[in-house]
Amino acid sequence: MSSFDLKQRAVEWFSNLGIPTQIATFVWICVPIVVLILGITLGVLVLVWLERKISAAVQQRIGPEYAGPLGTIQALADGLKLILKEDIIPSRADKWLFALGPAIVVIPVLLSFLVIPFNHQLIVADISIGMFFWIAVSSVAPVGLLVAGYGSNNKYAFLGGLRAAAQSISYEIPLALCVLSVVLMSNSLSTIEIVEQQSRFGILGWNIWRQPVGFIAFVISALAECERLPFDLPEAEEELVAGYQTEYSGIKFGLFYVASYLNLFASSLFVTILYLGGWSPNISFEQVFNWEQGEQLFAVLDGLIAFAITLSKAYLFLFASILTRWTLPRVRMDQLLDLGWKFLLPVALGNLLLTASFELALL
């Protein structure tokens, strides 16, 4: 790992511009957050475009074509349309709960990106309990769905909110147990240390080889948490019109879709971090060329390559999830709950017990 301290160099650069050190430190805190928000926005736009193109290819269609080159700004046009549409509030709805629901859904998903590392230094909040933080904030989002369904004063919306709550509880527990298995093997809750632990033996050190059962259970639980087909029961159009978002319009309606894609994007990144080695195997230019000069250039190149590797693995998982949407049929609600409680929970619990036994045997 390079000794290049990005924070220190950034503060020094701001100080050289005549900015006091305290203000420069505050600016450094704000810059990664702004960059993260812009990066998340761009990543979601790319994800929406990829899903439309891949879905069109599966169905032997062309997909978005006229909005920009190859339809690349179609998602931006759709977002602008939703922003400009009228925000209608039903007369008998609870106005406070109706407005609060989308915010409760989006904010926890945005917070989960704070602990996602793209490199040793490309992370907003390097806390020692990163995985616990993600599990904690992700469990808040279903409350927003239930609030949105209840506040709409609509039977279809309320049923969709109840389904979302039941589905989240059913799959949050297996998801957390799979994370605990990885944490036991890594001996840390830090996302960076989990990646570093996998990088010791290159590709063979990835947790997907040591936790194959946990990987499968985690992927299924993550897809169910994101309410992706075949687990989109809370918003099944044929049964519930649009589920908990039936009465929503305009920007509030768009926030639910943004939260869905953000959750899918975050889940794919956590799959990469937990099981696919994160940014490893990364190439350190400083070690390869052994040059004493150009330390900053090496650090920038290392960071860019690590960022590209992490995103490549994440979008590979996204590609698989998009194909799954057009491959598998939607399950019934009883089948969904049976899969979570009668299959995934025992499998994830057994995997955790085996992992704990193995780790104790190595002491």
From Swiss-Prot:
Pfam families: NADHdh. Signal peptide: none annotated. GO terms for molecular function: NADH dehydrogenase activity; oxidoreductase activity, acting on NAD(P)H, quinone or similar compound as acceptor; quinone binding. Keywords: Chloroplast, Membrane, NAD, NADP, Plastid, Plastoquinone, Quinone, Thylakoid, Translocase, Transmembrane, Transmembrane helix. Its EC number is 7.1.1.-. GO terms for cellular component: chloroplast thylakoid membrane. It is a multi-pass membrane protein. It is an enzyme of class 7 (translocase). The chain crosses the membrane at residues 26-46, 96-116, 127-147, 175-195, 203-223, 253-273, 303-323, 343-363. GO terms for biological process: aerobic respiration; photosynthesis, light reaction. It is found in: Plastid, Chloroplast thylakoid membrane. It catalyses: a plastoquinone + NADH + (n+1) H(+)(in) = a plastoquinol + NAD(+) + n H(+)(out); a plastoquinone + NADPH + (n+1) H(+)(in) = a plastoquinol + NADP(+) + n H(+)(out). InterPro entries: NADH_UbQ_OxRdtase_su1/FPO, NADH_UbQ_OxRdtase_su1_CS. It comes from the Eukaryota. HAMAP family: NDH1_NuoH. NDH is composed of at least 16 different subunits, 5 of which are encoded in the nucleus. NDH shuttles electrons from NAD(P)H:plastoquinone, via FMN and iron-sulfur (Fe-S) centers, to quinones in the photosynthetic chain and possibly in a chloroplast respiratory chain. The immediate electron acceptor for the enzyme in this species is believed to be plastoquinone. Couples the redox reaction to proton translocation, and thus conserves the redox energy in a proton gradient. Belongs to the complex I subunit 1 family. This is NAD(P)H-quinone oxidoreductase subunit 1, chloroplastic. It comes from Zygnema circumcarinatum (Green alga). The lineage of its organism: Eukaryota, Viridiplantae, Streptophyta, Zygnematophyceae, Zygnematophycidae. The gene is ndhA.
